[in-house]
Amino acid sequence: MKTILITGATSGIGLATAKKFANEKNRLILCGRRQHKLDEISNEISKITNVLTLRFDVSDKKEVNKVLENLPKEFSSIDILINNAGNAHGLDTIQEGSLDDWDNMIDSNVKGLLYVSRVIIPKMIEQNSGHIINIGSLAGREVYEKGNIYCATKHAVNAISKAMRIDLNKTGIKVSEINPGLVETDFSNVRFKGDNNRAEKVYLGYKALQADDIADIIEFVINRPSHVNIADILVLPQAQATSSIINKK
């Protein structure tokens, strides 16, 4: 049984991954900001395996430290960290973008990943093992119109993942980055601030990736032999060639 910590576990890729690993009887630490969602997930998953839910905002470094430095003994030895929390806010030109949107993306996508990792990595070093999965994006490989700051945050995730592999090379800790293209989740609804019609149009006319597709990939990456590290995966829907070229019918 492995102990797996997942940030952003209340929806989308995080939730799909939590359910997949629960069915494999892993011990789960599920983190998110919405207590009612955490309660719903806990009620479902606790029937299958041991689960601990933690409500905190990854962008609040004091809260991150307080919560993760005081884990119950049963959950204190973390084998796998899945840095999934993050989102996009707005789709505007750089001259018209909202500073609050920029802060939200930088705080969650970059700082949040770093704050959580900074607490967990020393624990992994002590046990001389561990696996960090950073959820990046196709947006970390290219830049698309009006994607400016979101793309910048995902380029940062790519750089951080590479830096982690260098810094942790002698520790026995694996670092993997998974970079999806378009995945049909609440992502666009959050980006467009509840404009459901606009969000739904993002996924019309083609088959987008599903959260379960990414959960399957995470499972594959984690279950490789100890000498194998899948460092980097880019996965797109068949209909998607780049961030802006999508074969819609």
Outline where the language-model segments fall:
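Conserved glycine-rich cofactor-binding loop
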Residues: 10-12
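Residue(s) in the substrate-gating loop at a strand-loop-helix junction
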Residues: 137
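Active-site helix of classical SDR
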Residues: 117, 153
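The beta1-alpha1 cofactor-binding region of Rossmann-like NAD(H)/NADP(H)-dependent oxidoreductases
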Residues: 36, 55-66, 99
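Substrate-binding pocket helix/loop in short-chain dehydrogenase/reductase
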Residues: 92-94, 101-106
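C-terminal helical subdomain
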Residues: 177-178, 197-243
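Conserved glycine-rich Rossmann-like NAD(P)H-binding loop of the short-chain dehydrogenase/reductase
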Residues: 24-40
